[in-house]
Amino acid sequence: MGVEKIKAAFENGKKAFIPYVMGGDGGLEKLKERIRFLDEAGASIVEIGIPFSDPVADGPTIQRAGKRALDSGVTVKGIFQALIEVRKEVQIPFVLMTYLNPVLAFGKERFVEKCLEAGVDGIIVPDLPYEEQNIIAPLLREANIALIPLVTVTSPIERIEKITSESEGFVYAVTVAGVTGVRQNFKEEIHSYLEKVKLHVNLPVVAGFGISTKEHVEEMVTICDGVVVGSKIIELLENEKREEICELIYATKQKEEA
């Protein structure tokens, strides 16, 4: 469980496909059902969003999903309960994407305890600066839960090395400046940025933000170790276009054999 389980998703040249689902969008039964579907479809890790009223890193699609979840009365406690229940049925690693505020409001010790109970293997906190990681990092380390770092196009290499030196799991490389969301294409400099990150860190590098097509997936996994797809997954789940999700997963796995 925990850090080792995330490591296993990248072993032997495996390319990781990491779909993002908003916890409680459509209800908690829907969350469990979607996790079961993504596990069966061959996703490597599932990223579960904790809805928050001020989601600074989220684009419009994810913001709307979070608002739907909050409007329906979904709570952090409820999401943990759903994860505890579905964990009995699936082995796929769970990574939580949460802003710092919900963690502190819930109580950080209690939050980490619930992560353990629900079989959460890693967490991403996009608004937690590296300099303030000690707010939660020691508790997570003790629980063998990875605190996954985000690096951006504008991060100098020295900072990337510093941020990732004590990290575990994988490095989340943000591929665009700005918020999440669907994009048409990626600029050339993104390629050199990802190659630079790969060169300077000792963890798998996963690209995320704006990845929405098979072409994007193929492009990104030739350079790095996996992709996170968020806004597009929410859109496809909402419109019941699940075969397109399977195609994105297939596009990732094809690159393992290349």
Swiss-Prot record:
Pfam families: Trp_syntA. Pathway: Amino-acid biosynthesis; L-tryptophan biosynthesis; L-tryptophan from chorismate: step 5/5. The alpha subunit is responsible for the aldol cleavage of indoleglycerol phosphate to indole and glyceraldehyde 3-phosphate. It comes from the Bacteria. PROSITE patterns: TRP_SYNTHASE_ALPHA. Belongs to the TrpA family. One of its GO terms (molecular function) is tryptophan synthase activity. It catalyses: (1S,2R)-1-C-(indol-3-yl)glycerol 3-phosphate + L-serine = D-glyceraldehyde 3-phosphate + L-tryptophan + H2O. Tetramer of two alpha and two beta chains. Keywords: Amino-acid biosynthesis, Aromatic amino acid biosynthesis, Lyase, Tryptophan biosynthesis. InterPro entries: Aldolase_TIM (IPR013785), RibuloseP-bd_barrel (IPR011060), Trp_synthase_alpha_AS (IPR018204), Trp_synthase_suA (IPR002028). One of its GO terms (cellular component) is cytosol. This is Tryptophan synthase alpha chain. CDD domains: Tryptophan_synthase_alpha. Transmembrane segments: none annotated. Its EC number is 4.2.1.20. The active site is at 47 (proton acceptor), 58 (proton acceptor).
